[in-house]
């Protein structure tokens, strides 16, 4: 195996391939998470619960996939790429259903009860973290199979002979990443090119004017929040299933990425194209968290060999970016304001 060796750094082509794959996965996951915030907030609902959506989507989808995989342990079907990806699609379907139901917790309390949306979103994040933690604890106490999808790893559509770079890129490729890329294109077109997208944006900018031409503002807000929650949940599910994160734990999964995509959404100025570029920027630095500790040998100073430093880097950059660029961001004018038809 050929190695690139530079002053204590030993990097194999396989590792370079996994870096690029991680970059793509994080890019897709973060973009979908950012789109989740965009759809919700462009309709007029502040969605702080993106982290909860990503966490719940990853947990529910993984739970289904791991149970199906364990039930079929030892079966030749688990060596079939198409069948394994069918299991991933089942998990994705469950993820969508759970996220769709979860979205109504935020939208109902925000629209019907007119509660403070920031507080509601924060509470929902805490609720989901507690549900996932308790669910995982009960799962372990019941002596059920471990929650992981490691039985699906290395089930490749095609293995490249003597081409470690491409094997690294495609070693854990599954259909969810393809679905994610297609979904990014579809959601971009919906927001920018369709009547539904125009109506959603109108409800976030000037709900009174939208109502005056017959648009049902609250209905559009329910739809925007539902699309946003599902999009973020799929992003979380893709990140966990495409990257080799192993057994589920609250901190080794997607916990915390929702707050990063909030920053991505703000930096993207609630526009699909800008959110995509911002997501790719942060995806690069997030993927470095794993890559650096794999690539560097022990000859490099401990500071540069610290995974914690590189895992912290995207969040540090998010804070700095918000400090310098947040003044240029323009949120929807009616964001966070419950619509009262009588006050029109």
Model feature map: region roles:
Residues 27-36, 52-57, 101-104, 219, ...:
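Hydrophobic alpha-helical segments embedded in the membrane of multi-pass proteins
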Residues 128-192, 251, 298-307, 336-344:
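Transmembrane helix-bundle core of multi-pass membrane transporters
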Residues 74-129, 281:
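Alpha-helical transmembrane segments within multi-pass membrane transporters and channels
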Residues 1-33, 46, 60, 71-90:
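Membrane-interfacial amphipathic/re-entrant helices at transmembrane-helix boundaries
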Residues 205-212, 217-219, 293-344:
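Cytosolic-side transmembrane-helix boundaries in multi-pass membrane proteins
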Residues 168-248, 277:
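Helix-loop-helix "hairpin" substructures at the membrane interface of multi-pass membrane proteins
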Residues 242-315:
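Transmembrane alpha-helical segments in multi-pass inner-membrane proteins
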Residues 42-46, 102-160, 193, 255-256, ...:
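Short loop segments and helix-boundary regions at transmembrane helix junctions
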